[in-house]
Amino acid sequence: MKFAIVVNVTRQNALDLARNLALWLDERKVAYIFESLSAEKLQTDNSAPIEELNKHCDAFISLGGDGTLLFTSHYAVTKPVIGVNVGYLGFLTEFTQAEMFTAIERVLNGSNTIHTRSQLDATVLIDNEVQHLRALNDVVIEKGAYPRIPTFIIKLDGELLSSYRADGIIIATSTGSTAYSMSAGGPIIAPKSSVFVITPICPHMLTVRPIVISDEKIIEVSVDAPDGSFPLNCDGNLKKMLDPQESITVRKSTVAINLVANENRDYCEILRTKLLWGREHNFGTIDS
């Protein structure tokens, strides 16, 4: 068994944890390799470019927050990912720093379980070539710096759903429902639900609401505007500036992400903990 390790190099505590992890693995004679930027910060030559890690390892370890895990998952493809939370919220990162070594031991002895998460596949023309872009959380088309409110045209399986005057459109998986979509007013969806959610960003009409659809649907989105260019983001990464009337097609990807599960956590507990549900808030009093 060989691990590929990806570290959020902007966090000193993540780098410190990576050093401790390397020592722990060395003591047990377990093979590992760092992603190149992580290795540079840790001053080790045991590294490979992120694009090549998949062919050098059997599993990935992500040391950071949800953003680091999203980044790692794109290169892990179907190989298992152990997400260790060294960030803030940590919806996707299953393990605390204190739980990291136990999680790795379970992977080593084959006693771990896997959470399989669906992804989105966005088909778009880039440099005159059809490209397939994967996203674990969401695909987002925004108005960007466009000075007016554009109209987003959405079709489901070729049939017109509606046209939205809005600042953007979020298409999210159940995994991504607690990310940007939730901030824009979208519903929270349990992880194993076979659905997607389409969430408008700041729609011009109050009657416009997010819609939950089957993940078997094929979604087509285009921007109706006389000019301008519109950012297409997959999991927060800019992939292309869309032209007016240019369409993208979003469907369920044939590739799923495999996250190593923390059997000591359940989804309801995560929601209560991360979103502070059921807690009394003391905002203080105003002196008269």
From Swiss-Prot:
Location of the protein in the cell: Cytoplasm
Protein name: NAD kinase
UniProt superkingdom: Bacteria
Primary gene name: nadK
Record InterPro entries: ATP-NAD_kinase_N (IPR017438), ATP-NAD_kinase_PpnK-typ_C (IPR017437), NAD/diacylglycerol_kinase_sf (IPR016064), NADK (IPR002504)
Swiss-Prot/TrEMBL keywords: ATP-binding, Cytoplasm, Kinase, NAD, NADP, Nucleotide-binding, Transferase
Family designation: Belongs to the NAD kinase family.
GO CC annotation terms, alphabetical: cytoplasm
Cofactor: a divalent metal cation
Catalytic site positions: D66 (proton acceptor)
GO-annotated biological processes: NAD metabolic process; NADP biosynthetic process
Chemical reaction(s) catalysed: NAD(+) + ATP = ADP + NADP(+) + H(+)
Summary of the function given for this chain in its UniProt record: Involved in the regulation of the intracellular balance of NAD and NADP, and is a key enzyme in the biosynthesis of NADP. Catalyzes specifically the phosphorylation on 2'-hydroxyl of the adenosine moiety of NAD to yield NADP.
Binding positions (NAD(+)): D66, G67, N137, D138, R148, R165, D167, T178, A179, Y180, S181, M182, S183, N237
